[in-house]
Amino acid sequence: MENKALNSPNRQYALERTRNIGIAAHIDAGKTTTTERILFYTGLIHKIGDVDDGNTVTDWMEQERERGITITSAAVTCFWTQKQEEGLYKSFEALSNRINIIDTPGHVDFTAEVERSMRVLDGAVAVFCGVAGVQPQSETVWRQATKYKVPRIAFVNKMDRTGANFENALNDMRKKLGAYAFPIFLPIGAEEAFEGVVDVVNQKAIVWGAGDLSTEGLKYEIRDIPAALQDKAKDALQELIEAVSNKDDVIAEMVLEEKPISAQQLKAAIRRLTCLIELVPVLCGSAFKKKGVQVLIDAVVDYLPSPVDIPCAVGLVPGTTDTVQVEADDRAKFCSLAFKLWRDAYAGKLVFFRDRRASCRERVSLVV
């Protein structure tokens, strides 16, 4: 339910329906490609750009387009309504959501750019290469997210590549990052045979057309889980329930009383733990082959926090050393965090800031 006390009547998307997220990864894990696909499936763009062609939305600098890497963080906003689909329970079905995305650099030379972005995120999608698993910069951005207490979900990308191994990438997260990570989706096939994912919570298979890129990944089928994967899917569900019950009192009590746990109850518990940074849900797919991106967007809405789900920010009272708790509230005085300065050849000096409380209008002077 929306908390109307916190939301201005002029706000088109309630704070509860807003997600402020970042996409972070080691270089070449497919971070910008994933972002581009998200923008396409949410309808912000109508033609998918390519990093190698230098025409993606978030790589806008000339140097980025020439080199095919992200140098500076780029912010973009898109909108997503969870579809009602038979066999799949979703936490916020038929509700429209605003997703503000910051696409961060993956190269080690631009680590500071990631650091300043982490300070203003409510949640993050950590992208991992399905072949290489956890790489050096993966560890760096993970530490930065931990430092700023950013809840995150993980997306194992490039499952279509030769040598892709979902289990190895998952074990990497657990061993190298110390993540309490558990899959909520499993791959169907791997390398050239990768065709879709198993939804562990709903116990359904989601399959995209094999090798058919003409539909741009817009069409997929929801099926029963293939016989060869049914035992694995059941085991993954049981492992997920046990992992959640170790951290969540509601599910723990249901397990002890041997009560059946619905997809709705399990998803609610996963969301609670993700927002508390006590669990990392893990998904998989191939952004380049346009498989698994829609379920990733659903997961952003289902599991990552809104501005009202995170602890209050702590700010300084201007002209003093006193601190103040800043909660998301449209009724209160405007308060924001300036996190980046940029000098533009035409506009001059620009200040990027994150609204922490209330909102501002055009042509209003702010004290920085």
Model-predicted segments: where are they?
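Structural and coupling elements of P-loop NTPases
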Residues: M1-R361, L366-V368
